[in-house]
Design a protein with these regions (language model features):
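Active-site glycine/GP-rich loop and adjacent strand/helix microenvironment
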Residues: 1-212
Length: 212
């Protein structure tokens, strides 16, 4: 396992060296770091080990990225979709098209603004975990927006498919100057502050935010 958080244009060759050393059967990565490595390989004609398969996640895999990555590694790349609460939710099959949901242990739905189930149109992702007996999550809203496909896959797998991950809902803090700050600021702001066991943030007006 190698961290991509320290990756930059000056050390991409170090990641390639590690791939060539370990010769993994499968390479699992965030989409963008693997895409950046692939561009470096193709632009500099670098020799790199070719895994049997490449698995990407954490963000959408666009077709131009798929082409670049597969050219660099001479391997097929399959995108996945998941979140911390459920891990792998859906994944591409050999057809590399829509994402098959893991319906053997997850119920994946999308709801419209009236909390009605929708198929073939974008909605809020809600998930029920059928295997989590420690902390059951029932119709859990994970903040993502997606479109569940109306069609079946030609691969023969009967599991339902997600046609597209359309985006994500986030809490945003708006400042007096009009700047918009992601709500994720606060967890990162306080995570290293050991004297604080818990905290809560609330907004009364645009110019006033209380943390207690």
């Amino acid at each position: 396992m190698v961290s991509t958080f320290s990756m930059n244009i000056n050390n991409l060759d170090e990641y390639i060296t590690k791939i060539n050393k370990y010769k993994p059967e499968a390479l699992i990565s965030y989409v963008n770091p693997l895409y950046e490595i692939a561009k470096f390989i193709n632009q500099n004609d670098v020799n790199v080990y070719s895994p049997q398969s490449l698995l990407t996640g954490a963000e959408p895999l666009y077709e131009f990225q798929r082409i670049e990555i597969e050219k660099a590694f001479n391997s097929k790349v399959y995108n996945t979709y998941g979140c911390h609460e459920f891990m792998l939710i859906a994944a591409e099959c050999k057809k590399q098209s829509d994402l098959h949901t893991n319906s053997d242990h997850l119920v994946v739905e999308t709801l419209d603004e009236n909390n009605k189930s929708v198929v073939g149109d974008v909605g809020d992702v809600v998930i029920t975990d059928l295997m989590n007996y420690g902390m059951p999550l029932i119709r859990y809203v994970n903040g993502d927006r997606a479109t569940i496909s109306q069609k079946s896959c030609s691969c023969g797998n009967p599991l339902p498919m997600i046609e597209k991950i359309n985006g994500r809902k986030l809490d945003v803090i708006k400042t007096v100057s009009g700047q918009r700050i992601p709500g994720e600021l606060f967890p990162h702001l306080f995570k290293e502050f050991s004297p604080m066991d818990c905290w809560q943030s609330s907004t009364s007006t645009v110019c006033r935010r209380a943390v207690c």
